[in-house]
Every structure is written in C-alpha cells, then in structure tokens.
Amino acid sequence: MSNMEQDRWSRVKGRLRSSVGEDVYSSWFARMDLESVHDESVHLSVPTRFLKSWIQTHYSDKVLSCWQAELPEVNRVDLTVRSPVRCAAPAKEAPAPVESRRDEQRPSAERSNGATPVSANHDALGGSPLDPRLTFASFVVGRSNTLAHAAAKQVAEGRRGDPVMFNPLYIHSGVGLGKTHLLQAVTWAGNAGTERKVLYLTAEKFMYGFVAALKTQTSLAFKEALRGIDVLVIDDLQFLQGKTTQAEFCHTLNALIDAGRQVVVAADRPPADLESLDERVRSRLAGGLVVEMAPLGEDLRLGILRSRVVAARTHHASFDVPQPVLEYLARTITHNGRDLEGAINRLLAHSKLNNQPVTLEMAEHEVRDLIRPSEPKRIKIEDIQRIVARQYNVSRSDLLSSRRTANVVRPRQVAMYLAKTLTLRSLPEIGRRFGGRDHTTVLHAVRKIEGLVSKDTTLSDEVESLKRQLQE
C-alpha cells in the first residue's frame, strides 16, 4: 500500500470511528484492512465470516459513505475474509508484539514475507487459530495486569488431576489491553506438554461449531469432544448469541467445572454486564475468579513499546526508535495496546520505505490520528452503590434489600438516579442490579430525585458531591 493510500485509509477510518463511536468501531472495524482501491471500487478485508456478515448487514451504507467522502467516485465497497496461514509452533526466537490481537495489521515491509502466523489448535475439534507471538514470554507485566497474568500463569502451569483453584477464570477489560494475548499464552503453555488437552475458541467459533453440528446431526459428538477437554479457553464471550447456543455453552460450562476441568473466559465487560447472556451463565461465570485488566499505565505502555521495537529488530536489525520518541508515544497514545503496536508499525514502515531514521518530528506526524482526547471515566453501578452507601452511612446490601425505612429509601433513590444519569444502563437493567426491582420503581426514583434537587439545596449539593467522587 502506498503512503497516499495509507493516509487515505487513515482518514476514512477516522470518519468511520467518529460516525459509529469508539465502542462500535473497536468491536467491529478495528480488524478491517484496506486491500486495494481500483477505479470506482474499494476492496476491504476482515479476519472472519462473522465480521463480514455483521458489517455487510448493519454498516455497509455507512462504510460506503465514509469512502465517498474521501473519493466521491467510489460506488462499491467489496468485503472479503482474509485466509490465515497455519504453522506448527510458536516462533521462540522472535518476541511478540505485546498486547496485540491475533489479526493485527503488520507493516507492508513485514507482510511481504508472509501473512500473520497462526497455529493449528485441535483442528479436529474446530479450535480457533493461535498466533505464535502471543506467549507468556512476550507479555509485558505491569500494575494494571499483574493479577490477571498471575492467575493465567497458574492455570497454564497446572497438571491433570491437580485441584482447580480458579474456576472459571474470567478476565475482562476494554479492547486492546491484552486479554487475547493472555488466553492464547495459556493455550500455548498448556499444550506444550502432552499431558493436557487445551482448546482455544472464540465465542463466534463456538457458535459456528455448534450450529454446524446441529445441521449435520453431529451435536452429540460435538458435545462429547468439548467435554473431553482438560482446559477450555473461550475468547470474546460478549459475542455469544442465541438461546440454544447459550444453553449449550451453559451445559458445557457446568459439565467441565463439575468434572474438575478448567475453564478460562475473556470478555469486554464483567459477567453481570453481559445483558444478552442468560442469567444462569452470568451467575456461573461470576462464581469463579473475576479479574479486571485496567487501562495501561504510562510505564507499562513504555515497556510494550520497547518490547515491540525488540520484536521488529528480529527482521530489521537496524531499526531503532530513540528514547525521547518512545517516551512521547507512551505519554500521548493512551487508549490501548493495539494503538501502540500500530504506532511502531508505522514508524518501521516509514523508516524502511523512505530510508530515514526515526525522529520525534516523524513520529508526531505519523501517529497524529492515534492521539485521542481523554475519554470520560466509565462509571459502574457497583461504584455508585458503594460510594452512595458510604456517603449515607448505610451498607450496599441495604440498598439492594427490600427495606423501606427512610434512612435507606432516600439513598437507594439517589443511587438509582445516579445510575440512570451517569451510565448507559437501561431502566430494567438498573432495577435488576438493585435487588431485582422493576423498571417502574427505577423511573419513580429518578423522577423523585429530579424533582427534589431543584428545590432542596442540601440534596442538590450531596448529589453533586457524589458525582464528583464518582468522576475522580
């Protein structure tokens, strides 16, 4: 891809991100690549059929309009599925780019030597491809991911017959913070010996496998194969759809846990927030060890950048990024690890294709679209309940209870009001999180507090104080 096409593609992605929002973009478009632009058509690719189908069904017009804003003559956007190349084992001599997903785009200079490497992963059982770069050796540990890394390492080092400590192990975080890296590291390490069978599946792969088994009347064999696994690793659980598929996943989860087998799951939110999942599944997932991977701190971002430079030198020995440039990138690119990976890839491509050393001026120009304004803090209902309970000297269990004494009712109403105004949760979801109340109770509480804060200055000050505490 030429520099002009790269710039054009960056502008189109920027329009698309602005149009659909960061969450939607990260979920559906982050792994979409530009293959070519020819006359009036654009050729894009994604790594899975599921992504292709979803984007074509829900966003094809939006993608086309973003391209037409850049190139008015474009009248067609073709979307295809990239075919990964399989290989046998992780490349031990090459440290992986940390925090990157398995389908991360690589610079054109690297792609010329082959597609992103992936590995066979119990193909007979329909395992998802593995990236040999995503191992424990290449994972950079920092304060935000220490617990998740330690728990994953403990799971990976277990032996058949050992007591299972964390079951299921549930890891959640925003996109690009290293969940997939840890899950694939568990799979690589677990399969390094011959003692245990470890299977890595994305949620969409689980869905496709189960639906295909139903169509071919081989569902019994599918179930037996899954339940014969020692460690089942499921990624991107938020994409698990369909009542029948969710029921089968729940049965598999129960069967494995009851048999003392290990289950490891990752998603982009905690179990309680997976509103599309059956309550039984959420409850079982919440019963294990739930670990959040927090956003990357500056020190960890710097470590990731250094690791990526070391990895790039495996194929480009002369590649170097000066320390001031690394510090600039770590300070300004704060969103996730994929953006850090992309920044190093851009500098590598620009340096090699133009035969120029990396400078701070070059970096400022090449990564300008990766520097995003600070995003508001994501506030959780649990945080609201905790801070409101502390403010009014009641317990969180009081807020969730059926008690109707005055010293509990008002704090509960304030907490519901804050949940409605500071989060994107629906009224039924807020009610469920407050002891199973219905949406009319929440609506009454919201209207009650809205009416009071306009008249009662003491209450108004209390509510503003709570908002400040939650947003700090």
Curated annotation (Swiss-Prot):
Residues 73-128 are annotated as: Domain II. Residues 352-472 are annotated as: Domain IV, binds dsDNA. The keyword ATP-binding applies. It comes from the Bacteria. Residues 89-124 are annotated as: Disordered. Residues 99-109 have a biased composition (Basic and acidic residues). PROSITE patterns: DNAA. Pfam families: Bac_DnaA, Bac_DnaA_C, DnaA_N. Residues 110-119 have a biased composition (Polar residues). Domain I is involved in oligomerization and binding regulators, domain II is flexibile and of varying length in different bacteria, domain III forms the AAA+ region, while domain IV binds dsDNA. Belongs to the DnaA family. NCBIfam families: DnaA. This is Chromosomal replication initiator protein DnaA. The lineage of its organism: Bacteria, Pseudomonadati, Pseudomonadota, Alphaproteobacteria, Hyphomicrobiales.
